[in-house]
Amino acid sequence: MEKEMLVLGKLKEGKFEKFMGFMQSEEGMAERKKIANPEKTVAAVTPDKSAVMFKIFAHNEEALKAFLNGSNPVSKPIFDEVMESYQIYDLSKVNS
């Protein structure tokens, strides 16, 4: 079952291009597909490129945590270089 989540990432100075290069690479896409459906992902970046936000539809929350916290051997080297910090939020729809 997919779960709507929001991931906020603060990037180290000047590392946006390196981060996005990995996220869009074959290797990065393969890892992202283990976590969520990339086709449904909604992404945003701050004007100064110091932070990114992704609304994802996760199907493997543990893989998401591993992808971000350094326990995934594929993402660890790049995230050690580019990621300053991150936060993960569960999203729930509010009926009006």
Which stretches of residues belong to each language-model region?
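Short S/T/G/P-rich N-terminal loop/turn motif that feeds into the first structured element of a domain
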Residues: 1-76, 80-96
